[in-house]
UniProtKB/Swiss-Prot annotation:
Domain Pterin-binding residues, every copy: 343-601
Keyword list, A-Z: Amino-acid biosynthesis, Cobalamin, Cobalt, Metal-binding, Methionine biosynthesis, Methyltransferase, Repeat, S-adenosyl-L-methionine, Transferase, Zinc
Positions with biased composition (Basic and acidic residues): 872-881
Organism: Mycobacterium tuberculosis (strain ATCC 25618 / H37Rv)
Family affiliation: Belongs to the vitamin-B12 dependent methionine synthase family.
Boundaries of every Hcy-binding domain copy: 1-312
Domain B12-binding N-terminal: 635-728
Protein's name according to its UniProt entry: Methionine synthase
Residues the entry annotates as binding methylcob(III)alamin: G739, D740, V741, H742, D743, S787, A845
Stretches for region Disordered: 860-904
EC number: 2.1.1.13
Catalysed reactions listed for this entry: (6S)-5-methyl-5,6,7,8-tetrahydrofolate + L-homocysteine = (6S)-5,6,7,8-tetrahydrofolate + L-methionine
Matching InterPro entries: Cbl-bd_cap (IPR003759), Cobalamin-bd (IPR006158), Cobalamin-bd_sf (IPR036724), Dihydropteroate_synth-like_sf (IPR011005), HCY_dom (IPR003726), HCY_dom_sf (IPR036589), Met_Synthase/Corrinoid (IPR050554), Met_synthase_B12-bd (IPR033706)
């Protein structure tokens, strides 16, 4: 039912909801269990609560009365199990309508008895999920929809004021219940509101994996009148999901939580939340999220509802600021139509008409291959999948059922159902719980009741789908911009006015035709399409625009098509195109297209002919003879043409594994395996190192080469003779030092050295020097390598070198040191002076390889040529470095001697008397079930692609630029990993613990108080150093002093936060490393690091949103608009972490842990004060406007 039709409702319930907060009832089952019912009461159907509507109406009347008398405005009927599966288990499925009517009539009688003109009482028909999930194939959609129709008819017969579809675990089941209820109302001629409550588990998603955003996107277009949450958890676990609904739902929002998470007690599962605790939580939700209805679920009683009713009686519900985001959704996630810096890409390869591979797989019923094609499009960067099964001679309905049912659970991408047959579209809609798009409608046979337009729109309206509308009318396809816009206007007015669909749910396809025929009438087709898009977006900015893009280039060869498609897409996007049906990986960035090709393609699009110049002929000439094969196929052909041993080395360089085994078999007929490795495979790895060193190869491709090297050696190993000393070129023991859990750098060294002929003994993280030396002695190591990321680790390395001196092993073991906190100067000057043996700094894995080669050459007595240009240059560089170091030391000593004593003030010039914002609560809270899309919006792509993945690009030269790599490698791989990690549930473990604590400053200390009073006792004291020059800053200066707090009667607020991605993402990365999937390992580890940072940034923003100044002005009001400015501290205040810069004392982290208790989200603190899991980070937040990073 559309918003315009809701005046037809036979109740004033929605009016009341709009005026005040309503209170629902609590649990029914809990009360029934306390009623001492006998098996006779159930007529032998033990557990069938619905039969009590007939046998014990008195018990149910009492329960309803108790809730009403406790203050409830509405009660739910005892009809939760009046559905096909529940009653079917008792062989009474034929009584769905009857028992629904009886249960509703009981509640109606009590409501009428206790209601009055001043305060009406309402009845909500409870509609539960049943025990069978249609998305998993347990039951047919149409069967349960019709059963829900029967249940709804009974509720209408009994006098319900609304239907509450609750405890929904499957979006397809929810859709069946809502649409079944609407069908019942049409049959009965009586219309009432429908509310929907989904159940989000402790995992942060619904039972089948649906995020709250996917649920809202799927449910709201069905025409429900209110959406909310119930069951599964207590209020604490619901806050993030309610926040999403509050911000994005255009309809009222409600909640009915359990009385906490159940705990096992003497009487079985017990719910721990007391009535006053539930009331406090729900009152907070109303104030924060603007809820319209609150109540309780499992474990809640009339006592709970009495406290809730009292707590919310006088609360003024705030006006919600809704940010609506037009979207479609899969079962799992929502995809907005508006994409940042991109059109919405609709993958075209799951189309039986457009993809030969997909068609052949569908005809052969090779559904796994069909799913693989769908997943490939996900990897290539598609946002939606266009699913078309129409093919001559096939049963389209059967094919659609087979594929839609599989894609429902196998694809994280929403589906665009593409068919000319309404029966085929309906089959798809009845297997997909997410919000689909329908492709398409037009006026080819008019708009009468029997037209295909009307039949398809009936499906669109009922299922709440988005719809593609083609600019075709009874006269045919529109060719001019004027005609395209004219038909589009007619479509928009018809679809919105007669079918109740939002403009934002309409995708107008202004059609494009090939401009490659040379025919005069087609020359302007590209221009007309572009201008139609521009005019349409000008008139209707909320309407989406789309195109079947590749039509523009039909008739050209594939290479020319790719260029013309890419250029045309760019021009359409500039005109306002929102989406395109296209093969995403076949689109080139404009800067990747050679200038001549780009200009000719633009001339063709805009019909820039001259007497002596035809851009169509010129484009065809440019691509004449150009192979239609992909660049990879060309490269494989080149590879196959090389001599065998050159080919093996080149396979390593290219990272090309296909055909490797056959080449190795052939090679072993000519040379022994060890010779193949040493002479040819290692030559390939040497080339890889040179390419990396010169900036011509990126780290991900280096790791791809290492994977092929590892595979080649593994294939050759069974054919090699084992010797007692199997150390290859040399042996190194690698370890991350004691107290440090970071191992990515160490593992990259492992990969490069082990694939260049060295034996690597990698003993892991947090290794004390005793263990490192024990392994080095046991394994007869040639070299010891130590790694660490933390500043503290540099101190540990120094201590380790001193210990090696003491043990007398310095001359025996040369040492390689690496890590983010180390510098070359520190190692080669300070540490080299301490260590009695060789110690070297390795900036990266390839410098480590070069150092190993040098050390092992010297050990073998292979002295380098002292007079070679390289040796002379190295000596000059070393002499220059030492002279520079000595000069720096001399200058520093002179400056220190010349310094005059400075009087350090007690406090800096930081403003002391600033307004203190009010926190939403005191103490700490935990947050789980975070929507991935919420915090990935603050993921720093540059830090990920450049810093973590090493996509550096070329500045000039022939190689791809950084910007090219971002488009071709970075973003597609990021989308792929986010999709996979989300689908596999790895990102479901992200969690936050944060809190607000009363604080004051005392000199250089921040004191956290036991309560928000200026004279309150000290809970924890944090001491900070003060700058000895400059502004003399100290962290404590940014917190109100105790003296000023006493004078103002108000303390300051100090927020703390700790975020974690959980252990599974680290476990997954380690599995990839162990399985030699080196590139994947690098990428997953990098994503884990940057997602942790993104979550920290996101939660810092949440804290700024929650801290309120006078006039209810949030601290976040000063936030920047551009994402990049977040990474430059463009907001008010800053967050600081112990162990760095201005707060170097890592011991203070233990106090923060005591305040936050992060064990509740699975984070612990090691003896070395490191957080576990590794992908966790903590901070305290300063709200002071002058608070920015500084060093002491």
């Amino acid at each position: 039912m559309t918003a315009a039709d809701k005046h037809l409702y036979d109740t004033d319930l929605l009016d009341v909801l709009s005026q005040r907060v309503m209170v629902g009832d609590g649990a029914m089952g809990t009360q029934l269990q306390a009623a001492d019912l006998t098996l006779d009461d159930f007529r032998g159907l033990e557990g069938c609560n619905e039969i009590l509507n007939e046998t014990r109406p008195d018990v149910l009347e009492t329960i309803h009365r108790n809730y009403f008398e406790a203050g409830a405005d509405a009660v739910e009927t005892n009809t939760f199990g009046c559905n096909l599966s529940n009653l079917g288990d008792y062989d009474i499925a034929d009584r769905i309508r009857d028992l629904s009517q009886k249960g509703t009539a009981i509640a109606r009688r009590v409501a009428d008895e206790l209601g009055s003109p001043d305060r009406k009482r309402y009845v909500l028909g409870s509609m539960g999920p049943g025990t069978k999930l249609p998305t998993l194939g347990h039951t047919e959609y149409a069967v349960i929809r019709d059963a829900y129709t029967e249940a709804a008819l009974g509720m209408l017969d009994g006098g319900a004021d609304a239907i509450l579809v609750e405890t929904c675990q499957d979006l397809l089941q929810l859709k069946a219940a809502v649409l079944g209820s609407r069908r019942a109302m049409t049959r009965a001629g009586r219309h009432i509101p429908v509310f929907a409550h989904v159940t989000v588990e402790t995992t942060g998603t619904m039972l089948l994996g649906s995020e709250i955003g996917a649920a809202l996107t799927a449910v709201e277009p069905l025409g429900v009148d209110m959406i909310g949450l119930n069951c599964a958890t207590g209020p604490a676990e619901m806050s993030e999901h309610l926040r999403h609904l509050s911000r994005h739902a255009r309809i009222p929002v409600s909640v009915m939580p359990n009385a906490g998470l159940p705990v096992l007690g003497a009487k079985g599962a017990e719910y721990p939340l007391l009535p006053d605790e539930l009331a406090e939580a729900l009152a907070g939700f109303i104030a924060e999220f603007g809820l319209s209805l609150v109540g309780g679920c499992c474990g809640t009683t009339p006592a709970h509802i009495r406290e809730v009713a009292a707590a919310v009686a006088n609360i003024k519900r705030p006006e919600r600021q809704v940010s609506y985001e037009p979207s479609v959704s899969s079962l799992y996630t929502a995809i907005p139509f508006a994409q940042d810096a991109s059109v919405l890409v609709i993958g075209e390869r799951t189309n039986a008409n457009g993809s030969k591979g997909f068609r052949e797989a569908m005809i052969a019923e090779d559904y796994q291959k069909c799913l693989d094609i769908a997943k490939d499009q996900t990897r290539d960067g598609a946002h939606l999948l266009d699913l078309c099964v129409d093919y001559v001679g096939r049963d389209g309905v059967a094919d659609m059922k087979a594929l839609a049912s599989r894609l429902a659970t196998s694809s994280t991408l929403p589906i665009m159902l593409d068919s000319t047959e309404t029966a085929v579209l309906q089959a798809g809609l009845e297997h997909l719980g997410g919000r689909c798009a329908i492709n398409s409608v037009n006026y080819e046979d008019g708009d009468g009741p029997e037209s295909r337009f009307a039949k398809t729109m009936a499906l669109v309206a009922e299922h709440g789908a988005a719809v593609v509308a083609l600019t075709i009318d009874e006269e045919g396809q529109a060719r001019t911009a004027q005609k395209k816009v004219e038909i589009a206007e007619r479509l928009i007015n018809d679809i919105t006015g007669n079918w109740g669909v939002d403009e934002s749910s309409i995708l107008i396809d202004t059609l494009t035709f090939t401009i490659a025929t040379g025919q005069e009438e087609s020359r302007r087709d590209g221009i007309e399409t572009i201008e139609a898009i521009r005019e349409l977006k000008k008139r209707h900015p909320d309407v989406q625009t789309t195109l079947g893009l590749s039509n523009i280039s039909f008739g050209l060869n594939p290479a020319a098509r790719q260029v013309l498609n890419s250029v045309f897409l760019h021009e359409c996007q500039e005109a306002g195109l929102d989406s395109a049906i296209v093969h995403a990986s076949k689109i080139l960035p404009m800067n990747r297209i050679p200038e001549e090709q780009r200009n000719v393609a633009l001339d063709l699009v805009y019909d820039r002919r001259r007497e002596d110049y035809d851009p169509l002929q010129e484009l065809m000439r440019l691509f004449e003879g150009v192979s239609a094969a992909s660049s990879k196929e060309d490269r494989l052909a080149e590879l196959a043409g090389l001599p065998l041993f050159e080919r093996l080395a080149q396979r390593i360089v290219d990272g090309e594994r296909n055909g490797l085994d056959a080449d190795l078999d052939e090679a072993m007929t000519q040379k022994p395996p060890l010779q193949i490795i040493n002479e040819h495979l290692l030559a390939g790895m040497k080339t890889v190192g040179e390419l990396f060193g010169s900036g011509q190869m990126q780290l991900p491709f280096v790791l791809q080469s290492a994977e092929v090297m590892k595979a080649a050696v593994a294939y050759l190993e069974p054919h090699m003779e084992r010797s007692d000393d199997d150390s290859g070129k040399g042996r190194i023991v690698l370890a991350t030092v004691k107290g440090d859990v970071h191992d990515i750098g160490k593992n990259l060294v492992d990969i490069i050295l082990s694939n260049n002929g060295y034996e690597v003994v990698n003993i892991g993280i947090k290794q004390p020097i005793a263990t490192i030396l024990e392994v080095a002695e046991d394994k007869s190591a040639d070299v010891v390598g130590m790694s660490g990321l933390l500043v503290k680790s540099t101190v540990v390395m120094k201590e380790n070198l001193e210990e090696m001196n003491t043990r007398g092993v310095a001359e025996k073991f040369p040492v390689l040191l690496g890590g983010a906190a180390l510098t070359r100067s520190y190692v080669e000057n300070d540490l080299a002076e301490i260590y009695q043996g060789e110690v070297h700094y390795a900036r990266d894995a390839f410098e480590g390889l070069k150092l190993m080669d040098t050390i092992m050459s010297a050990k073998r007595g292979e002295a380098p040529d002292e007079n070679s240009p390289e040796a002379i240059k190295a000596r000059e560089k070393e002499a220059e470095r030492k002279a520079r170091h000595q000069r720096s030391k001399r200058i520093a000593a002179q400056r220190k001697a010349a310094e005059e004593p400075v009087e350090v003030p007690e406090r800096s010039d930081v403003a002391a008397d600033i307004e203190v914002p009010a926190p939403p609560f005191w103490g700490s809270r935990i947050v789980k079930g975070l929507a991935v899309a919420d915090y990935t919006g603050l993921l720093d792509e540059r830090a990920l692609f450049l810093g973590q993945w090493g996509l550096r690009g070329q500045r000039g030269g022939e190689g791809p630029s950084y910007e090219d790599l971002v488009e071709t490698e970075g973003r597609p791989r990021l989308r792929y990993w986010l999709d996979r990690l989300s689908t596999d549930g790895i990102l479901a473990h992200a969690a936050v613990v944060y809190g607000y604590f009363p604080a004051v400053s005392e000199g250089n200390d921040i004191v956290v108080l036991t309560e928000p009073k200026p004279d309150a006792p000290v809970r924890y004291r944090f001491h900070f150093p003060r700058q000895q020059r400059g502004r003399f800053l100290c962290i404590a200066d940014f917190i109100r002093s105790r003296e000023l707090a006493a004078e103002r009667g108000e303390v300051d607020v100090l927020p703390f936060q700790l975020v974690t991605m959980g252990q599974p993402i680290a476990d997954f990365a380690n599995e990839l490393f162990a399985s030699n999937a080196y590139r994947d390992y690098l990428e997953v580890h990098g994503i884990g690091v940057q997602l942790t940072e993104a979550l920290a940034e996101y939660w810092h923003r949440r804290i700024r949103e929650e801290l309120k100044f006078s006039g209810d002005r949030a601290m976040a009001a000063e936030d920047p608009e551009a994402k990049e400015d977040y990474f430059k501290l463009g907001y008010r205040g800053a967050r600081f972490a112990f162990g760095y810069g201005a707060c170097p004392d890592l011991e203070d982290r233990a106090k923060m842990m005591a305040l936050l208790e992060p064990e509740r989200i699975g984070v612990t603190l090691s003896e070395e004060l490191q957080l576990h899991p590794e992908q966790s980070t903590d901070a305290f937040v300063l709200h002071h406007p002058e608070a920015k990073y500084f060093n002491v």
